[in-house]
Amino acid sequence: MAISGETIDYGPCAFMDFYNPKTVFSSIDKLGRYSFSNQPPITKWNLARLAECLIPLIHQNEDPAIKIATETIDNFQSIYEKKWLNMMRDKLGLFGKDKNDLKLINDLLHWMELNKADYTNTFCHLMNINFNNESKYKVMSFLNWFKQWQNRVLTNNGSVEKSINLMKKNNPTVIPRNHKVEEAIEAANNNDLSLTNKLLSILNKPYDNQNNIENYQSPSKNDEYQTFCGT
């Protein structure tokens, strides 16, 4: 992690289809150090390493410099939790704040994990983009949560229409599905860039409700997608 806020190491990485907080994409990450759920603490760890490099610039004496850096890094968790909660409220089209918001969000994530629901497509379903009409969204466990969500949407002068408009600004309808990226790479290696150009054209408008892109919205049929690290 650089002081500019940019990330430098981009691989191995991939996009998560079915929601699983333990998802990893590196063949050597056996303990889940870089799993989806471990991104916040590993980000804090990276920031701590960055702070170590800045110690000589923070204070002329090392001890007070370390104290300042430590206190600053310790603020990360509370800042992250607040930002994450606000982000998830936007993804669910929730205006204002409610004491039960965190539970509502975590209940949905837990349901996704238990039912192997696609992360991106679940939010699309809530936005009434029913491109696949999966039966899992008709089960009672989801419908019970859905009713709670609808009741929350109508609070704080909200409406379904206003909520969906907010959701459309915060939820992509299409992401670079790993299997589609692999297809494009394989074709490009055989001097065929048509799949690459098509994929880039679709991904250039991730928040639009585009026509005839269902094939790019479907998760891979494989249970696992693994990338490899050369280190």
Task: Identify the residue ranges that each predicted region occupies.
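Flexible glycine/proline-rich, aromatic-decorated loop/lid segments
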Residues: 9-28
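Hydrophobic residue at the +6 position relative to the catalytic HRD Asp in the kinase catalytic loop
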Residues: 1-3
